[in-house]
């Protein structure tokens, strides 16, 4: 379990009885299904439960082991996917014309070592998971990856971020990990055309959950000037990718997705690297391939990222929130993230401190999660926000 250093004074709670603690934990774990896990009411209630659990005394080592086992046992009981290849639906019980949550399973369906989410192309009124599944099935299997190719819930220009599809993809990831006992540190996003947009965007929003992303012939949403020239991309992409392996494929003569947005994104990543350090990014541009798959097929693209593993404890986090329901990013939690602001959090091992910069803006409802691999928890730990020390003390493991 993590240690938590809160940057604001915790609310004093009455001491909870053991039964009350178990009931609160169970309620927290059971809150929200695949359609409402990120609703405001659910998130608010989870926040209330966490605040109430502040009253639980620091955990002894034996208590920590018991709680970890309890969490693991409960997580194993949650819904799983059908353990078979082929097409199915996350919500299969409706009439055939009303079924939602289509996805195709392929790749290594035996004992996969990782998970690939393959995102299809399309647009307004179009888009089908099955051609994308066919393209990634063999390459994923040869690389010991389970492949899941979801279909967007609504076929719009930005289908991967519209109408609950983003949450649907995250639910598939969780259920796949649980069903096949997949290494959580080997989850990859890739996709072609609009699926390239999806892997760029969802990859950035949830970089803390991934090992790598490989967009193909699709870019992040560009920003154009009055003359129609690309000069930037939308917020919430480049900063968040600092600790994620990314390879972006593009053909210079692509008539459907021109190279402008991906070239701009590459420039912005180069600038971000100079500013914040980090980044593990490759831009793979060729000519003469049009809107087709990369030379050598999707397998060659996957080879660019498949050996990467998720970095769960990066020395530096850069986070630009764009989703009000995304409260956790690596080892920080922000109850009410300020949209589009940029937060930089550093582990300063030399002074045994966490240093956070927000551009001078106030920071409230913020929690830092630490363990023995990050700082020396036998000594005092400091939390410094915008050069002001807001916490100093010996940390103890909390529920």
Q: Whereabouts are the PLM-identified features?
A:
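Short, proline-enriched alpha-helix->beta-strand connector loops that line the catalytic pocket
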Residues: 240-246
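Surface-exposed beta-strand/loop patches in extracellular or lumenal glycoproteins
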Residues: 360-381
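The conserved beta1-alpha1 loop
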Residues: 117-121, 217, 250, 356
